[in-house]
């Protein structure tokens, strides 16, 4: 086992603090509407330009082991905040640095770190409660949704508007994804109804030559979880569908040989207008998705597991939809005939699975299923003039989307660092057990001014002057760093999601308090390779040079 280097008390904390400051100073330059960009070198391709705090933090590794430990712990603050709220990573970093800086001073002055931590925890708990109960307002109108999106995308109003449009079209539950577009402008592509990535099994099912799709109006939908290879199983049902004079979409594990050929012939001759596709997904997920389609269309999955067979299936077992489009690669079902209550019950059931799931991949797939049942899918295609700009813009749009979802979930507070300044009121009159805990509470009070100070500093102003001016106002009164004016921030459209502000404060305090209570740090001793090589060759006299050459090869 390699020898270790051990640092104690003040020496350890100072080294850790140096690493924290290095990372925080790099990240906080990006805060606010007038924050600057960071350029990140990549091992291949063009450098990345970003104004996203967590992207900057993730790139930073320091040479000194002890400084690096501090930087890595601070990095955890921004990545945790990003994972939970999707935004607010720079704010969280600024808060953590401020709590740590003030905390280190208190520890150096001889105060008990554990009592400081208890005081910090009390202060944060009171402040987050105040944010949620007193300051937060619901975010329901399209205007406020657009404003939150704009602020998070660095005051880009077009991004805010397109996110608000997407939410309006697919509902708050719908899935909104962000992709790289091919044009210069941002575009919104909305798919209504249920869409899955399986196309027709034979091009002979196409009935619209222009769009190259099989289009079925007012169609029956047969759902089967096994392969269909024998047409005799299907004949009774096909005859009934032909009598009803409606088209039919068959979704099954597969259709092969004679069965597929017979369906194609019937379709070409116009006896039954039919299209067939494979069921989406694999294994258990396939069964679940077939069940989703059944609920959406008011049909039943014909499955031997529940004692149903194809030859005994009737028209009552079939689902119905107003319109079905089947292209080469995907199928869209619009206007399913399922009962609204059944669909909502199914959605709740899937939501319960999301809560229990531990895998991010599973959660994403379950969330997609909710969207397909409850709303639809919207794709925001980001436009830009160059690849570097495209990457930067796409990251901003994704941030804005996360922030908007957070706002819809927990509401909004006035932005620009004002909400945290107002939440200082919650720290007045808090009970504490001793003087050290009181200092802990005051550390939180001082730190809550820091995001506003930093926003003003990045805009070229004097933080202390602005903080005093905003503190003398009340409610939504704050500072607009973009225009340099004071006023009602909600009216100006400067809003932050409550969840983002709350998460930033909680995560910052959690990690900063851990660092304050650190007394010892242990790291591997740096390996001195050169000294080792030189020492080994010392006895070889004239051959030393050769030995050195050997080492070089």
From Swiss-Prot:
Task: List the protein's name.
Answer: Chaperonin GroEL
Q: Which GO terms describe its cellular component?
A: cytoplasm
Q: Family assignment? A: Belongs to the chaperonin (HSP60) family.
State what this protein does. Answer: Together with its co-chaperonin GroES, plays an essential role in assisting protein folding. The GroEL-GroES system forms a nano-cage that allows encapsulation of the non-native substrate proteins and provides a physical environment optimized to promote and accelerate protein folding.
Name of the gene:
groEL
This protein's source sits in the domain of life called Bacteria
Q: Which Gene3D superfamilies does the record cross-reference, listed alphabetically?
A: GroEL (3.50.7.10), GroEL-like equatorial domain (1.10.560.10), TCP-1-like chaperonin intermediate domain (3.30.260.10)
Keyword annotations of the record? ATP-binding, Chaperone, Cytoplasm, Isomerase, Nucleotide-binding
Annotated PANTHER family: 60 KDA HEAT SHOCK PROTEIN, MITOCHONDRIAL
> Which subcellular locations apply to this protein?
Cytoplasm
Short name of one Pfam family:
Cpn60_TCP1
Q: Does the keyword Signal belong to this entry?
A: no
Under catalytic activity, the entry for this protein gives:
ATP + H2O + a folded polypeptide = ADP + phosphate + an unfolded polypeptide
Record-linked HAMAP family: CH60
């Amino acid at each position: 086992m390699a020898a270790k280097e051990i640092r104690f008390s003040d020496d350890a904390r100072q080294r850790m603090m140096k690493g924290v400051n290095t990372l925080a100073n790099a990240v906080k330059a990006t805060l606010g509407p007038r924050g600057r960009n960071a350029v990140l070198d990549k091992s291949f391709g063009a450098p990345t330009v970003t104004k996203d705090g967590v992207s900057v933090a993730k790139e930073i590794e320091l040479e000194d082991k002890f400084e690096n430990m501090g930087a890595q712990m601070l990095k955890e603050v921004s990545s945790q905040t990003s994972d939970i709220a999707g935004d607010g990573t720079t704010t969280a970093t600024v808060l953590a640095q401020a709590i740590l800086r003030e905390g280190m001073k208190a520890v150096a002055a001889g105060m008990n770190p554990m009592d400081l931590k208890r005081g910090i925890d009390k202060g944060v708990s009171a402040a987050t409660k105040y944010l949620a109960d007193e300051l937060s307002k619901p975010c329901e109108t399209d205007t406020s949704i657009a404003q939150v999106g704009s602020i998070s995308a660095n005051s880009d109003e077009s991004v805010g508007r397109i996110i608000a449009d997407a939410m309006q079209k697919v509902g708050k539950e719908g899935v909104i994804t962000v992709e790289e577009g091919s044009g210069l402008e941002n575009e919104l592509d909305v798919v209504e109804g249920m869409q899955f990535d399986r196309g027709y099994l034979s091009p002979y099912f196409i009935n619209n030559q222009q769009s190259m799709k099989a289009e079925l109006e007012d169609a029956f939908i047969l759902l089967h979880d096994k392969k269909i290879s024998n047409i005799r199983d299907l004949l009774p049902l096909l005859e009934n569908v032909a009598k009803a004079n409606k088209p039919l979409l068959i979704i099954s594990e597969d259709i092969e040989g004679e069965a597929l050929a017979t369906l194609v012939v019937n379709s070409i001759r116009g006896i039954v207008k039919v299209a067939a596709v494979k069921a989406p997904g694999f294994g258990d997920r396939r069964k679940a998705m077939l069940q989703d389609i059944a609920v959406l269309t008011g049909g039943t999955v014909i499955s031997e597991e529940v004692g149903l067979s194809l030859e005994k299936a009737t028209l009552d077992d079939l689902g119905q939809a107003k319109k079905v489009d089947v292209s080469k690669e995907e199928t869209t079902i619009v206007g399913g005939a399922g009962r609204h209550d059944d669909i909502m019950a199914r959605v709740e059931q899937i939501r319960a699975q999301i809560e229990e799931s531990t895998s991010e991949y599973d959660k994403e797939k379950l969330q997609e299923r909710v969207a397909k049942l409850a709303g639809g899918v919207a794709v925001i295609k980001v436009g830009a003039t160059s690849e570097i700009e495209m990457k930067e813009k796409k990251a901003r749009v994704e941030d804005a989307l996360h922030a908007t979802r957070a706002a819809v979930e927990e509401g909004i507070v006035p932005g620009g660092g004002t909400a945290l300044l107002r939440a200082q009121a919650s720290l007045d009159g808090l009970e504490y057990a001793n003087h050290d805990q009181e200092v802990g509470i005051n550390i939180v009070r001082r730190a809550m001014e820091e995001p506003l100070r930093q926003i003003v500093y990045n805009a070229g102003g004097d933080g202390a002057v602005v903080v005093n001016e905003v503190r003398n106002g009340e409610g939504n009164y704050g500072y607009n760093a973009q225009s340099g004016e004071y006023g009602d921030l909600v009216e100006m459209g400067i809003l932050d999601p409550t969840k983002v502000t709350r998460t930033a404060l909680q995560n910052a305090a959690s990690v900063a308090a851990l660092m304050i209570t650190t007394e010892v740090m242990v790291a591997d001793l740096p390996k001195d390779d050169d000294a080792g090589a030189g020492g080994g060759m010392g006895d070889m006299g004239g051959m030393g040079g050769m030995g050195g050459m050997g080492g070089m090869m």
